[in-house]
């Protein structure tokens, strides 16, 4: 009888294990089908992001322009190499595929059939380095709606809005002592209002008034709008500290609650400067496709700076964020921002 009980127990355990395995396998199959249905590409193999060389197939007229851009990367680049026979662990990329010759297209199809990793050059650089090479962008990059799910998925937008409101209310509660102390210190140090409002360009190019703690003298822009510099003489002593720790941004939590801003997104800029920057930076206004953020990928990935080159780099991270937006990415950026606030690593 005891032996029978043991056998039954073993049988039950086996069936449970088999059931769990089957369920897991069934779930994975459903996930694969879902990914295929949604048009999501399979993830690149690990070697794709560790390789020291890549192959680029593009129109001959674009070779020098691409070579110039890729010279800033520590990658050896081969252009339109048709002598390539061994495709094992080779990274094959293409650029402006609609303008490729028939021979180039056939080569890329054959390379795919033989197991090479083939993908658009900009997408490859984007995935590998964590920012978008805006100098190589064409309008077609933005026309794949599935790649920019934050723009087209209402469920994603509603979830983000719920998280924004919840986080902003919680942060206001937790930081209320800091907000009160900061307001007192600003008032004690210099004459003028504790808060100031400034027009910024938000989602869909609609302007709104952003609220911040005043960190500069009252007459800081008596001579007109100017870029803030690293050691700006207009910044007060209290202002220098709250800018370094980003405490000056805390009143923008009210902008988040009101719906002007999000907790995470590209930082809002003034229209005066946007008009200058869009003359130098491709697709600069695309950052306005989403709500501006209290913090963003650019702010936790790139040091503080106010030059044109700094603006270009921040735009690279902003475009990457918009394309790859997820709740997980927002959480990651937010946690990195907390480190900046606690240790003053930002400015």
Regions found by a protein language model. Give the residues of each.
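Short, contiguous acidic/charged loop-to-helix segments that flank catalytic cores in large enzymes
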Residues: 226-230, 242, 321-325
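Alpha-helical membrane-protein architecture signal
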Residues: 151, 155, 159, 163, ...
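Bateman (tandem CBS) regulatory domains
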Residues: 143-147, 166, 223, 232-237, ...
